[in-house]
Amino acid sequence: MKVSKLWLREWVNFSLTEQELAEQLTMAGLEVDAVNPVAGQFTHVIVAEVLNTKPHPDADKLTLCEVNINKDKPLKIVCGAANVRPGLRVALAMIGAHLPGGLQIKESKLRGELSQGMLCSATELGLAEHSEGIMELSDEAPIGMDLREYLALDDHVFDIDLTPNRADCFSILGVAREVAVLNKLPLIEQPIVTVAPAIDDGLRVNLIHSEACPRYCGRIIRNLNLEAKTPLWMAERLRRGGIRTLHPVVDVMNYVMLELGQPMHAFDLAKINGEINVRYSASGEQLELLDGQEVVLNDNVLVIADKEKPLAMAGIMGGANSAVQELTQHVFLESAYFNPVTIAGVARKYGLFSDSSQRFERGVDPCLQSKALERATELILSISGGEPGPVIESFDKKFLPGTVSFLFDTTKVKKLTGLSIPLNEMKNLLEGLGVVITKETNHFFEVTIPSHRVDLQQDADLVEEIIRLYGYDKLQAQPMQTSVQAGLISAKEKIATHVSSWFSAKGYHETISYSFVDPELQEALYPQKEFMELLNPISSELSQMRAGMWPGLIASMIYNSHRQQTAVKFFEIGVVFDLDGGQLKERSCIAGLLMGEQGNLNWSESARLFDFYDLKGDLQSLFASLKLNDVEFIQSSHHALHPGQSAQIVINGKHSGWIGVLHPRLSDAFDLDQDVVLFELNLESLINPTIPLYKPISKYPQIRRDLSFLVDRQISAMQIERVIRNTVKEDWLKSFDVFDVYMGKGIPEDKKSIAVAMTLQDDTRTLVDAEINLTISAIIKKLENEFSILLRE
């Protein structure tokens, strides 16, 4: 929000310097980012009048001018601007003047003709970044008057960075309220004239979706003066507020928005068919906006429409077809209250930003609409003339914000801030904000909140207001006077710490990504899930809560792979959000991925790419470190994973996660030329409820037996291992490893050869060959019965 100091002083008569005011506002929560002069440094520039002109005899693009400066005789000026003409009042830099950039004006000859000064453009005076021709001043500008005095250029603009809760300060009036209460000064109310209608014309307004727009005010003004121009004083105030001038009616709309905080819009009445309908758009409706962009609307965009078509995106931007043009003679003015939830996020979704949307999505005063409309009418009539109709107001009281009243416990100021502030001081501060105290009982105030402070809803909000107005600098540092008891670390926190350290030691890099994700990416990875949509997203690419950890990891991986990272090893621990039947449930997860080359360049071995088994091996090592023995990798299909390289992870009989290679369809979509291997696990599934017990290492010898089987291709090593573990008695099987898998020549097409190594050992004695042979025979028989496996010699 850009605020002119001189404009602000019309509302509250303070005597602070620019630096003092900036510090005061910043300490009160309205952070001032910059304080800038409204014009460049220049001297001896006055208002002058061009009396007559004639072409330069030796230069086609130069003009000889006689200029009146209210002295005995006119000055001779050579000018190169195309818009110089007799009768024009201009900005004249006199001989000896200093202009921005260090230019000093001297008497000189241009192509042989005397020039006793310089007619200036707005750019040359530091009043605009771009301008065409010299400045054209009002016909009423006093000849000979210093330009700085005439345009009130000894002014500064405060650039205020407002927090989202302070929508009330998006206006001169709002900031003036703050300055008044901070300095205990009265607010100079600017009277708003109620304009009597001169004609009976009006438009019917239908609030079809009144929950989104519970109040809509409008007014017709006919027979505008097409020759009218925006007065210089208004154009200057708009410039200082960061808004360029367009058309007298549009400029008034923007002026009232800066002054009072109510965004408004003007329609060309001739382009409206019959009536105004405030409704949601139909999916597929199109609208060309004021900036020339054509948008295709979905079914949740609030629009202002007539009988047949949308005219504007409500609260965001008007349509080009119904915009006020140079030849517009009849207008319809709009001043409405839109529900902030309806506007929030829509502008960002369509890549739009406007001063209106910025204000509406934070919340405007729901009682301001008719006042702003009267103020705009008054200004338009004074500039462009015209015949106003009556104010048309449609509202639905059911959806208008009600008056906020509650019982404020003043003792909470001490409890929450540690400051003892007298009750009278609290009362004065609150009343300075416009809060009405209807009753005082002991330490309680019955308060009614003013309609413009939509952010004040409870005790804590009033405590914040009191302390910021009283002064944060009065908060004294005090030692904590309480007993502090160390908290307990939960099992989930312990496992998260262990797993994070374990993966870091394995060479993985931990990532931390937003819980907000790109809807397109998430729907591609989890098409079977429901997703939680954000009402007010940071951007359209971050508009859903994540239902899994993979979107963030994949986005980080793509970012790094595009920056010549040849090996990517990432993991992330975080919370995911499951939407189940409208209920939101949070789940702690860990996920990771591998992509690229395994290991560093090494003369003794060639590099290879990460594969499924690298990640599976890391997970098996993790499970071993956590003493999780009942873990299975069961081949299964997942929409985001390769059909032949994906598996469910089952821990203690419960589905706990997934592992696999990213589906080729997705790899192609992400323009990846290498496999990406991913996993995701519920963090709680890694918590081992059993307490580890000491067990001595066996001093008896281990015995290894190798077996080679011919099996059907669809049978997994996990299935074979499960049968073997169930067959071997007691705790003899210490390890089970697959050391060879072969499919090809000499093997039937529907078969494969698997060779496994088993390590057998007893903790209390030495195993003898006879009992080992019986065990091996039992294993072979069981496998033959279960899977028709054939033992290979």
UniProtKB/Swiss-Prot annotation:
Location, primary (coarse class): cytoplasm
Q: List each copy of the B5 domain by range.
A: 401-477
tRNA processing recorded as keyword = no
Q: InterPro entries recorded for this chain?
A: aa-tRNA-synth_II/BPL/LPL (IPR045864), B3/B4_tRNA-bd (IPR005146), DNA-bd_dom_put_sf (IPR009061), Fdx_antiC-bd (IPR005121), Fdx_antiC-bd_sf (IPR036690), NA-bd_OB-fold (IPR012340), Phe-tRNA-ligase_IIc_bsu (IPR045060), Phe-tRNA-ligase_IIc_bsu_bact (IPR004532)
Matching entries from SMART domains are given as:
B3_4 (SM00873), B5 (SM00874), FDX-ACB (SM00896)
Task: Please give an example of a GO cellular component term from this record.
Answer: phenylalanine-tRNA ligase complex
What sequence ranges are listed for the domain FDX-ACB?
Answer: 698-792
EC number annotated for this UniProt entry: 6.1.1.20
**Record text on cofactor binding:** Binds 2 magnesium ions per tetramer.
**Ranges of residues in domain tRNA-binding:** 39-148
Q: Where in the cell is it found?
A: Cytoplasm
One Gene Ontology molecular-function label: magnesium ion binding
* Reaction catalyzed: tRNA(Phe) + L-phenylalanine + ATP = L-phenylalanyl-tRNA(Phe) + AMP + diphosphate + H(+)
Task: Return the similarity comment.
Answer: Belongs to the phenylalanyl-tRNA synthetase beta subunit family. Type 1 subfamily.
Protein's recorded name: Phenylalanine--tRNA ligase beta subunit
What species was this sequence derived from?
Legionella pneumophila (strain Paris)
